[in-house]
């Protein structure tokens, strides 16, 4: 279906959002801009926008096939996708399978510890406050979501983790941790939104433990473009 792109509604760190001729559909346009540490570090990863767009769409289509509702509608070009217009629930959901990043620092443990079961964390999606960690009781107190919505978000998040770990294991990648965002459609349905990419996931090569994600930019390791391309190459080869 053809969607006429209208005015820009929003511009974030990694994407722009445009209205369309359909009031229930918006167009997401992925940028090459890269940020870390809540926007304190800024740069560019050449080609990132196109890779993240295609990878997100590929994975969301697979998740839909397995029963996880998403905002995905139609891939329009290498950088643009039509998605359902949603009201984002201001909770970032972090699932962790292996210790790394802020988890390792917060609890004083080494990176690379494989957990017996995945952990789940929430953070309040608020740049001005630095996206502070919160629990479900905080979310209820602040009326960010209802108990039923929180329960459903947790159910979907763990389901996404199980499925993504399987997808990544087939291509020799460990899914270390990742961030999800959910939104509500016009009729109140909770769906997976935002993106699934090396911007939002920690991905390590299963054999070498080489980092294949935004940590390469975040930690000034170099090779971010090549890492993103490698994940995409493996994922597309698994079709």
Indicate where each model-derived feature is located.
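An exposed, glycine/acidic-rich loop-and-rim segment of catalytic or binding clefts
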Residues: 113, 123-131, 138-146, 223, ...
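A long amphipathic alpha-helix within ATP-dependent nucleotide-binding catalytic cores
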Residues: 144-176
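C-terminal helix-cap and adjacent tail motif
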Residues: 196-239
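Short histidine-centered catalytic/ligand-binding loop motif
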Residues: 40-50, 133-156
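Phosphate-binding core of ATP-grasp and ATP-grasp-like enzymes
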Residues: 113, 118-130, 161-172, 197-202
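Active-site loop/lid in soluble adenylation, ligation, and acyl-transfer enzymes
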Residues: 2-124, 235
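Conserved metal-phosphate-binding beta-hairpin within the catalytic cores
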Residues: 95, 175-194
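A short glycine-rich, hydrophobically flanked beta-strand micro-motif that places a catalytic Asp/Glu
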Residues: 74-79, 168-184
């Amino acid at each position: 279906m053809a969607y006429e792109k209208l005015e820009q509604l929003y511009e974030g760190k990694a994407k722009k959002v445009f209205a369309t001729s359909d009031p229930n559909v918006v167009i997401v346009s992925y940028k090459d801009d890269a940020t870390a540490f809540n926007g304190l570090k800024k740069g560019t990863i050449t080609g990132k926008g196109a890779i993240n767009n295609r990878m997100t769409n590929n994975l969301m289509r697979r998740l839909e096939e397995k029963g996880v509702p998403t905002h995905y509608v139609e891939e329009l070009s290498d950088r643009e996708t039509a998605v359902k217009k949603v009201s984002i629930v201001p909770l970032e959901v972090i699932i962790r399978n292996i210790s790394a990043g802020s988890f390792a620092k917060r609890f004083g443990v080494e990176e690379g510890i494989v957990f017996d079961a995945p952990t789940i964390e929430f953070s309040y999606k608020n740049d001005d406050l630095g996206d502070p960690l919160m629990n479900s009781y905080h979310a209820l107190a602040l009326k960010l979501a209802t108990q039923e919505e929180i329960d459903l978000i947790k159910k979907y998040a763990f389901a996404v983790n199980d499925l993504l770990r399987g997808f990544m294991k087939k291509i020799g990648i460990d899914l270390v941790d990742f961030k999800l965002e959910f939104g509500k459609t016009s009729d109140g349905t909770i769906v997976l939104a935002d993106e699934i990419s090396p911007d939002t996931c920690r991905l390590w090569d299963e054999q070498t433990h080489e980092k294949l994600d935004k940590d390469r930019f975040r930690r000034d390791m170099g090779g971010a473009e090549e890492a993103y391309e490698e994940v995409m190459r493996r994922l597309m080869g698994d079709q």
